[in-house]
Every structure is written in C-alpha cells, then in structure tokens.
Curated annotation (Swiss-Prot):
This is Coenzyme PQQ synthesis protein A. GO terms for biological process: pyrroloquinoline quinone biosynthetic process. Required for coenzyme pyrroloquinoline quinone (PQQ) biosynthesis. PQQ is probably formed by cross-linking a specific glutamate to a specific tyrosine residue and excising these residues from the peptide. Pfam families: PqqA. It comes from Pseudomonas fluorescens (strain SBW25). There is a cross-link at residues 16-20 (Pyrroloquinoline quinone (Glu-Tyr)).
Length: 24
C-alpha cells in the first residue's frame, strides 16, 4: 500500500522501524 501523503509516509517509516526492531 503506497500512499501519496507525506504525513502517512513518515508514519509508515516509523512503523517499519518499529516492526524491524520488534522482529529482532
């Protein structure tokens, strides 16, 4: 799901990082 909203993009990046650390 690729959204064109900058705010959502930033939020998604933060979520990706959170999931990344959660997976470790």
């Amino acid at each position: 799901m690729t959204w064109s909203k900058p705010a959502y993009t930033d939020l998604r990046i933060g979520f990706e990082v959170t999931m990344y650390f959660a997976s470790r």
